From Swiss-Prot:
Ribosomal protein among keywords: no
NCBIfam families hit by this protein: NOT-MenG, PRK09372.1, RraA_entero
CDD domains: RraA_family
Gene Ontology biological process terms in this record: regulation of RNA metabolic process
Keyword Electron transport: no
The protein's name: Regulator of ribonuclease activity A
Subunit description: Homotrimer. Binds to both RNA-binding sites in the C-terminal region of Rne and to RhlB.
Database matches in HAMAP family: RraA (MF_00471)
Organism: Glaesserella parasuis serovar 5 (strain SH0165) (Haemophilus parasuis)
Domain of life: Bacteria
InterPro entries hit by this protein: RraA, RraA/RraA-like, RraA/RraA-like_sf, RraA_gpbac
Amino acid sequence: MRVDTSELCDIYSDQVDVVEPIFSSFGGLSSFYGKITTVKCFESNGLIAEVLEEEGQGRVLLVDGGGVVRRALIDAELAQLAVDNGWEGIIVNGAVRQLDVLETLDIGIQALAPIPVGADDSMVGEVDTPVNFGGVTFLPEDYVYADLTGIVLSPELLDLQSEDIE
């Protein structure tokens, strides 16, 4: 289903938080939404891989890498794992790599920047913990909506089929 964050902000202005415009789109889908699962980690993606092994239908993985872009937290292998397990999208407060592959995959991916250096695969970090970046606090179980215009956060599922959005 198509997501239009501009229209969501117009309709649900009192219900949503808008993430600062610091992200770019790197995946094959330009818009996506779902219930948030968070991973907080620093230059390692072992926990990310573990979470992406789970069923992802209706879910978006939100990775807080501290805004560090020295190492890519998502690469082609992890993005493909997400696709294989039905994840709707990935948002990374950090870097990604292998853009030529990422842009062909049937998943939305937003991140700060690309870099060719990969992360280590240690299992250091936290899963399903509140994280704060881009001017908002993301709580596990919140809903996130993303498109090429921006990222919007809501504590509850928004009606994307509203006549106002059509």
